[in-house]
């Protein structure tokens, strides 16, 4: 039964990624430098939320969603580059979470996850994601301007994550309080 729930998390995370990336492209297409790296990249925030909540299953869902969009030529027509970028889309938030837990920012069960801790984690996530994706692009011969791409990717991940995190917070603040009895 647990495997069934975990597969459900993977599928829903992947579908949410596809939907949010499509929405992101529609809304921000006039401002983006490329389809995969924009000034505001909302799926990065989704990855952070899903990996915080569902750990490796959220990471797997992010990678699957990125792969689905990549195979639709969002990233490139090169399947190896697409697969690598998809893996990194799931790996970056998972790696950031693991680093923050290891550095005692918060516990595995999210005890101690404060607003300032979440902000530091968001900045760390944007840096890790930007660095991993830019290194992958350079390794695949598609890096172009390394520092410009790194700055753009970092900014897009950071702003996208902040938009998603604050949207989730706003939603949670306005949900009716559930009774505990």
List the model feature ranges, each with a label.
Residues 19, 43-44, 155:
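Intrinsically disordered, low-complexity regions enriched in small/polar residues
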Residues 2-32, 47-53, 57, 61-141, ...:
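Short helix-perturbing small/polar motifs within transmembrane alpha-helices
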Residues 38-46:
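Hydrophobic alpha-helical segments embedded in the membrane of multi-pass proteins
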Residues 154-163:
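Hydrophobic transmembrane alpha-helical segments of multi-pass transport and channel proteins
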Residues 40-41, 52, 154:
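Hydrophobic transmembrane-helix microenvironments that flank and shape a buried ionizable site
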């Amino acid at each position: 039964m647990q495997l069934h729930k975990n597969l459900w998390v993977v599928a829903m995370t992947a579908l949410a990624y596809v939907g949010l990336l499509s929405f992101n492209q529609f809304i921000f297409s006039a401002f983006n430098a490329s389809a995969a790296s924009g000034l505001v990249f909302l799926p990065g925030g989704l990855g952070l939320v899903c990996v915080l909540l569902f750990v490796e299953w959220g990471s797997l869902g992010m990678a699957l969603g990125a792969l689905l969009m990549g195979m639709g030529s969002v990233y490139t027509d090169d399947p190896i580059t697409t697969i690598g970028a998809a893996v990194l889309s799931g790996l970056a938030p998972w790696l950031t979470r693991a680093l923050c837990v290891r550095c005692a920012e918060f516990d595995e069960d999210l005890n101690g996850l404060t607003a300032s801790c979440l902000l530091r984690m968001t900045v760390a996530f944007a840096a890790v994601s930007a660095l991993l994706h830019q290194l992958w692009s350079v390794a695949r011969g598609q890096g172009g301007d390394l520092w410009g791409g790194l700055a753009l990717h970092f900014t897009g991940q950071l702003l996208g994550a902040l938009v998603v995190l604050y949207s989730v917070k706003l939603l949670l603040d306005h949900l009716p309080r559930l009774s505990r009895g």
